[in-house]
Amino acid sequence: MLGAAPEILVEAWTYLAVLIGLSLSGVIVKRAGFTETASLFALGPAFCAMLVIFPGNAFSEREHIGMALFIPLLALHAWRARRDAAAQPGPRLALLAGLSGSILLLVKPYYAIMVLAPALVVAVRRRSLKSIFALEHWVIGGICVVYLSTVTLIHPEFMRDIYPLLADVYGKIGIFWPIVIGYGFSWCFLVFLIWRLWPAMRFPELAAVALAASIAGMFPLFYQAKGWSYHAYPAIFCAVAAIFCLLAVPRIVQQPSKLLAFVTAPLRAWALAAVAIAFLPYWSTQKPGPALVAAIRAATDRPTVALVSSDISSGHPLNRMIDGHFVSTHVSDWLGAFALSLSRQAALSGDTAEAMRYQAIMARYVESKREEFARLRPDIVVFKKNNTMWTSQLMGRFGFDAVLAHYRILVEDETERIYLRDDYVRPGHRPPEQPISASSPVAASD
């Protein structure tokens, strides 16, 4: 599109989403007339940093873009929660906030809980359920229904084939303690600071709806149970946003607490420390080493690529950095690897029928992968070295060692091994000429 790389267009769309989200939120906050409006505008760069810098390795993920557009809806909820508001939001702002906020639900429907929780705060605050049926919620519901209907009409195979497989295999693989350690402790620290910053005898509506959304955002994180940093971003962002909103409240009166007398540093410093700790999971990158990339680029030109790995990070962004092209229907082997894991779990629990069912899913996947390798003959095979449970099955049981016998090792690092097809010839490069025997007719004619 427009001759630009996809990464450029995705980044441009992300920055546009951030601009729309912050601008519309600013309009809503200003019209609502919050006492902290001036301070919030002064903290605008901090909110922008949370949407542009803080996401780190989650930048341009669906949750990131969805949260950038979700902020106006939170601001609208805060406005509706005000008991002393001079006026209520008009239909135009409600429509825009609903349109903007619906993106997060289109990303993943269970983020609807992040809409419901702030709406319940408004209902309790106003002592009326009318806010649950506000215009913005009807807009969100309508968009979701239209989207689901469109997907079902255009891609009926998604609901018929793909979604049941995702629920049966992908959805059943999860972790718990890594999420608690990686995100739970830092999130609890943020909530602790929210409690410390909460003003006495006041109800800061903006902070309240952000906190409610943050608490609600923890449920999808544990429900998905994968531990990816972008899954935690909605909950972490809303918690930090609540802290910013509390810092903007004028003349905050802190709650006295003898248990916290040891805390002598200013709360702003503690807030900065909490944000820094919460940022740690977003700091790391999956960029491959320059030596690996250079070796592949030197030997190939726009190669076709296939993975032997359950994790797509083995091939992305590597594939883009070498100007490669994935040729497999399933880019990564998550389906086969997850089915293998579930089969072993079922066998350990004594459920033989379930174990055999998942074995069959794995076998069908591997056979289709072998057929694709034979038919498409990828130039490059990216092999994940530390995924032994899966790769040992491919090599020992399904004969992928015979497939890789037609490849040679080009380069490898600590995590990946790159195979190059034996008969691959780099476009534009002629193979070296064979020396001519002195007894040959050509030599004799010379």
Residue ranges and their predicted role:
Residues 114-141, 198, 253:
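Perimembrane helix-loop-helix junctions
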Residues 56-66, 228-229:
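Short acidic/glycine- and proline-prone juxtamembrane loop motifs at membrane-interface regions
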Residues 65-85, 93-101, 239-242:
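Specific aromatic-rich, kink-prone transmembrane helix
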Residues 12-34, 41:
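Transmembrane-helix motifs of polytopic, lipid-linked glycan transferases
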Residues 68-69, 113-114, 224-258:
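Hydrophobic/aromatic-rich transmembrane helices and adjacent perimembrane loops
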Residues 110-111, 151-157, 267-436, 440-442:
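Extracytoplasmic
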Residues 89-109, 115-120, 214-222:
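Membrane-interface alpha helices of multi-pass inner-membrane proteins
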Residues 22-29, 183-207, 211-217:
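Hydrophobic, aromatic-rich transmembrane alpha-helices
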